[in-house]
Amino acid sequence: MKPLSLLAALVASVMSCASLAAEPIVIKFSHVVANDTPKGKAADYFKKRAEALTRGKVRVEVYPNSTLYKDKEEMEALQIGAVQMLAPSLAKFGPLGVKEFEVFDLPFIFDGYDDLHKVTQGPIGRGLLDKLSARGITGLAYWDNGFKSFSANRPLTSPADLRGLKMRIQSSKVLDAEMRALGALPQVMAFSEVYQALQTGVVDGTENPISNLYTQKMHEVQKHLTLTEHGYLGYALITNKKFWDGLPADVRGQLELAVKEATTYANFIAKQENDDALDKVRKSGKTAIYAPGPAERLAFKKALLKVHEKMDDRVGMDLVQSIYKETGFDPAKL
């Protein structure tokens, strides 16, 4: 090869390598809810901060509302590397084989956000995230959504009112036991299918934080909503472990900061978003809203406490007891 030709080839090679080096790292972030939910807003905030902090080295593509993968598909997509990040509900990890996460599904185990954050922001929560590593997943943080309430097409003022109702749940042995303890018939169903199922009568009711109920327009096909706040629905922000470990150290550090900022934002707005959604449901006039008094809420607690005992072996008695100790919950005082 002539010297000039060799020089030209070397220059072209260097330019090609530089071009490849300049290509941003793409993070596909799939989720199943609307953009204007706590998770949807947090995902968009993470995108904004990740791209800013890495100065364009990372591009985050957010796919909301099951536009890329449905509820039951996204975990496998993450494990095979088809997407890089998810924020699935905590109930999703039980079917994955990490049954301890179903402790978050236990009814009334948390009496509000203060109790919850003692767990999710402490060593118990970190220890649970670390259990995902064996599944090829790195757990990054917990994102709040809110506390769930029951909805149906008939009034639900006592535990007995749920008897015989077909209630949609996520795939969770704990949630299955919860509904059966109330005499309801649990129906596992993907989140994206719930509105149509309620509309057509395939299921009679569901349990959701109010932001999910409102943004998915479920209030349009549910005549009654009872503010039981009986259970928590939150998310774990997770990533493919091989992808995360393979990132350049500086980029990973910048993304860790973006995760921290997005988590603070997510958990700050969660309660506000649910309060705003409740106000919008009320103003819509489509759904009658019932707020149980202390005695009525206690009746729901007593009816559902047996689920804790039944699920001890599944989620781990030591784990349940450690949460009781952390939050000060004492079932004997009910």
Label for each model-derived stretch:
Residues M1-L7:
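Bacterial N-terminal signal peptides that target proteins for export
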Residues A22-D115, P123-L334:
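N-terminal secretory/targeting leader peptides
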Residues S16-S19:
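N-terminal signal peptide c-region/cleavage motif recognized by signal peptidases
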